Curated annotation (Swiss-Prot):
<feature type="region of interest" description="May be responsible for inhibition of the platelet-aggregation activity">
    <location>
        <begin position="112"/>
        <end position="133"/>
    </location>
</feature>
<feature type="binding site">
    <location>
        <position position="43"/>
    </location>
    <ligand>
        <name>Ca(2+)</name>
    </ligand>
</feature>
<keyword id="KW-0479">Metal-binding</keyword>
<comment type="similarity">
    <text>Belongs to the phospholipase A2 family. Group II subfamily. D49 sub-subfamily.</text>
</comment>
<dbReference type="InterPro" id="IPR033112">
    <property type="entry name" value="PLipase_A2_Asp_AS"/>
</dbReference>
<dbReference type="GO" id="GO:0016042">
    <property type="term" value="P:lipid catabolic process"/>
</dbReference>
<dbReference type="InterPro" id="IPR001211">
    <property type="entry name" value="PLipase_A2"/>
</dbReference>
<dbReference type="Pfam" id="PF00068">
    <property type="entry name" value="Phospholip_A2_1"/>
</dbReference>
<feature type="disulfide bond">
    <location>
        <begin position="73"/>
        <end position="97"/>
    </location>
</feature>
<dbReference type="GO" id="GO:0005576">
    <property type="term" value="C:extracellular region"/>
</dbReference>
<comment type="subunit">
    <text>Monomer.</text>
</comment>
<feature type="disulfide bond">
    <location>
        <begin position="65"/>
        <end position="136"/>
    </location>
</feature>
<dbReference type="GO" id="GO:0005509">
    <property type="term" value="F:calcium ion binding"/>
</dbReference>
<keyword id="KW-0964">Secreted</keyword>
<feature type="disulfide bond">
    <location>
        <begin position="42"/>
        <end position="129"/>
    </location>
</feature>
<feature type="binding site">
    <location>
        <position position="64"/>
    </location>
    <ligand>
        <name>Ca(2+)</name>
    </ligand>
</feature>
<keyword id="KW-1201">Platelet aggregation inhibiting toxin</keyword>
Length: 136
């Protein structure tokens, strides 16, 4: 019941495609996205600076960079179509912005899944990110 409540609160709190991105992350990692990645390392969550703390954090930096590249598409608000098929995430969008945002999220979710073994609880709610922002 507690997990259901947490998921319900998370669904209410997200905006735009963040729910869609969260579903992709959950599918690839088995982790609740907002709890596991909402403030992980220096780049998972809002903002970011300093060197990534591990491969998981690097996935988030790459995702931030991807969102920067598609910034004119309002990536945090753009809703897109996708599906899970035979273990893959398929982006189903003819619109270039929707496809680009979906691909950013898809690649980040795959990266997080491939690096789930680098996830280290000591970087959850990590606050020592004081160095300069990493270049994309």
């Amino acid at each position: 019941m507690k997990t259901l409540w947490i998921v319900a609160v998370w669904l209410i709190a997200v905006e735009g495609n963040l729910y869609q991105f969260g579903r992709m992350i959950w599918n690839r990692t088995g982790k609740l996205p907002i709890l596991s990645y909402g403030s992980y390392g220096c780049y998972c969550g809002w903002g970011g600076q300093g060197p990534p703390k591990d491969a998981t954090d690097r996935c988030c930096l790459v995702h931030d960079c991807c969102y920067t590249r598609v910034g004119d598409c309002s990536p945090k608000m753009t809703l897109y179509s996708y599906r899970f098929e035979n273990g893959d995430i398929i982006c189903d969008n003819k619109d270039p912005c929707k496809r680009a945002v979906c691909e950013c999220d898809r690649e980040a979710a795959i990266c997080l899944g491939e690096n789930v073994n680098t996830y280290d609880k000591k970087y959850k709610s990590y606050e020592d990110c004081t160095e300069e922002v990493q270049e994309c």
